[in-house]
Amino acid sequence: MHRRTFCKSTVAAAIATTLPGCGSGSKDAGSTISAISMDGSELSIESAAVGELADSLQGHLFLQADQGYAEAKQVWNGMFDDKQPAMVVQCGAVNDVVNAVNFARERDLLVSVKCGGHSLPGKSTSDGGMMIDLSKMHSVDVDPDAMTLRADGGSLLGHIDGAATAHEMMTTTGIVSHTGAGGFTLGGGVGRTDRKMGLAIDNLLAATIVTASGDIVRASEDENPDLFWGLRGGGGNFGIATEFVYRLHPFNPTVFGGTLTYKFDKDFLEFYALLHETMPVEANIEPSFGPGEDGKTIATVEVTWCGDHAAGAKALAPMLVHPGFLSGDLAPFAYHDIQTGADGILGHGHQAYLKSSFINELTPAAIDVIVEFANRGAVGSWFQHMGGATSRIATNATAYPHRAAAFNFGIMYFGDDPAQNEAKVAAVREYYYAMEPHMAGFYTNLNDDDEKKTWGNYGENYPRLVELKNKYDPSNLFRLNANIKPG
């Protein structure tokens, strides 16, 4: 680790010119590093203290001028490529997380946490703060007899999928395999198997976190059950998760389904609403709406059946004879293929903006809005299929309250030209606000920064979450998330 001074033209340039050794790699005892506090004010941190932190780590500490910094600070959403943390603590063990948390708390330093770096609103990074990076902590172990899987906090969903399917087992994971397990799980965990197996949090048996006080705390139904309740949907508000233990289910890694296309219109959406009401929980049916080869909007439907293939062929047969059906077929295929199928298209570095919310019922009025805006073609939209096992748990049984949701509906811009960002973000928002009367809360993993909405999103569970925040993070050290403020 080179104890170099943090310099950032837009955040710290004004004071950087007054600090000794700025950008020079100085190791003088009196040199300082410029950083940002939790309230946004400027901090000066002694380089010697940063050096002591670096020496305490099994992993690595990167400052802006260090070789490897650019790669270490990288996050998924290219809209936040210009963010420059003062330091990246790339942890190699749980004690590294403890040391980083203690260092940040003692100095009131802004903290972000990165596992896969997939935070859509860029909460995995910051300007001038400390990024605590868990990406090198990704060991995964399966106990096939107990039907459980243990994963380090920096594990990616692909690590979990691969380990579980090797034993013909599975737990619910998401739709892009390079997503971090930590943020995915703590926010709820919506995926292709959730209708049959439940959300990720419904399969979470235990978690270990490092709290704001630097304590290592395990939470389960039997240990710290209040914290365990909050971790299941409360996001990263209470600490940094360094380990998860999940329940596994028997699973055939060869599933049934395929990709089908349909003429996009009101009739298709009414058909989709009917499919939701009638399909067994083994079926996961997720349409997206965008331009076809002729430029007209079509529905592209991803179908996954996690169960007996013959039963799936029979149940899904109506999808192949609908009047609006255009192309595609249903057949057995490797679950791994669909779980990794979007990894390239949704790779790192693109410009991405998304707003989403849950829908309890696809009403005629909601259908009219979707038809209007999807046909405009300015931005894409899609459904994640829910219900089934996700709805069999009481609203207050976990922090995640959205048990009545039939769908998660997303509206997204994804591209490579930053010059389009302003117009595309405006188009997403216009579509979203038109849909808002038909929505019922949002998935915190796809949240915006609206504090009022975060408060309302948890409903009757919110006061209990505030109590947990007061207990485990009274200074709101962990604030770069769907934040629950202490009170």
Where do the PLM segments sit?
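Soluble FAD-dependent oxygen oxidases
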Residues: 2-487
